[in-house]
Design a protein with these regions (language model features):
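Auxiliary Fe-S-binding modules of radical SAM enzymes
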Residues: 1-18, 64-67, 71, 194-198
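Short Fe-S-cluster ligation motifs
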Residues: 64-86
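Short glycine-centered, acidic/aromatic-flanked micro-motifs in structured strand/loop junctions
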Residues: 27, 85-87, 184-186
Length: 198
């Protein structure tokens, strides 16, 4: 499986069919993957093969990188439609995630006020109040559900937390009172000799 890792904090912009001109944000190390899932389809590769050795960027490094890139884009006459947190794994694992979202809102409001802020998350950190507060502040809170069957979640997403399952996830999703989008990867095929069809 070919893999893709982002080598910067801010990457792009890329043209997304769904989001438009998207400026990517990677809050994770640039040399590997940090994730609470080990999805069979992950573009970043499998966790064991892509283990990060470097540290996560600091809140200050993220803020400075975003401000520099948006300033350069302004000079080039390019405006992003969205600032998208994705990157080399699960962005909500960054210990300063809530503060980084706050900083991003301030920077966005100053330099590109029409741009939305989106977070692509696997929803494993919703038990943390700080993560929920931050996700409730972004424009596009995009959370993942690949299956409602725990057996399929274990097969497709391969969560690190043995107790992670759909019932718990559903209760946590209800707390957003509709302020979310669900993202699903539909699969059909064989993985390690087992049929996968969600």
């Amino acid at each position: 499986m070919s893999t893709l890792l982002f080598d910067k904090i801010v990457f792009g912009p890329i043209h997304s069919r769904r989001l438009g001109v998207s400026l990517g944000m990677n809050l994770l190390p640039t040399d590997g993957k940090v994730c609470s899932f080990d999805c069979i389809y992950c573009e970043c590769g499998f966790n064991k093969d892509r283990k990060a050795q470097r540290r996560m960027p600091t809140r200050e490094e993220v803020s400075e990188s975003l401000r520099e890139r948006l300033t350069q884009m302004q000079a080039d006459g390019v405006t992003p439609d969205v600032i998208t947190f994705a990157g080399n794994g699960e962005p909500t694992l960054h210990p300063d995630f809530e503060y980084i979202i706050s900083d991003t809102i301030v920077t966005r409001d100053a330099l590109c006020p029409k741009a939305k802020i989106a977070v692509l998350s696997n929803a494993t950190q919703l038990h943390k109040e700080s993560v929920c507060r931050a996700l409730n502040r972004v424009d596009d809170n995009i959370l993942k559900i690949d299956s409602v069957l725990d057996s399929r979640i274990r097969q497709i997403d391969r969560p690190h937390a043995s107790g992670f399952g759909f019932a718990q996830l559903l209760e946590q999703l209800k707390r957003f009172d509709g302020n979310l989008m669900i993202q699903t990867m539909f699969l059909k095929g064989d993985v390690d000799g087992q049929s996968v069809n969600n």
